[in-house]
Amino acid sequence: MLSFTGMAYFPYDPSFRVTGHFVPDPKLATATFHTSHGSDKDYYHIGDVSFTLKGHDLTLPFFARSNDPAKIKSGQGFFTDALTGKGAYGAGRYINIDYQNSAHDVVLDFNTAYNPDCARSPYWTCPLTDLYFDVPITVGERDPHSLHHDAS
């Protein structure tokens, strides 16, 4: 029998807390993601956050499950990075922002990056992303399958 031993995180690093600029997508365009179960799942593109991290200019799109702005409270950004499959979960990680339907500055704290539910159970269906940051995101939740939870 397996027992829950807690969740593993990389050490906190304040340099992974950055301010970016959110630009909403007025069309809330449909984005179809392939999932961990081989099906497709529709999300709605709520906008993009542009930011600089470790000297790299990056953009992270954010998505919601609703296309009704009155019902959207937050958005999820899906990403992979240089540690994906090497200490970070192989299908990528997520980060959330509060939703406002206007351009504004927003803080992205990658220390809060988390694994999708499918990292812990094969019964969950999770969207997969091909967005790759060529920057090792050495903060946030680690791969729960990594025996040593080691980023090396």
Protein language model features and the residues they cover:
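A structural detector for beta-sheet-dominated domains
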Residues: 19-21, 52-54, 61-63, 80, ...
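Mid-length scaffold segments of soluble, non-membrane domains
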Residues: 35-90
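Extended, aromatic/histidine-rich regions of cofactor-dependent oxidoreductases associated
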Residues: 105-107, 111-152
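Short beta-strand segments
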Residues: 56-60, 93, 106, 133-135
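N-terminal domain-onset segments
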Residues: 1-30, 37, 41-43, 47, ...
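Short loop/turn segments at secondary-structure transitions that flank enzyme active sites
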Residues: 24, 66, 83-85, 114-116, ...
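Acidic, glycine-rich flexible loop segments
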Residues: 76-116
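Short beta-strand-initiation
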Residues: 13, 44-46, 90-92, 103, ...
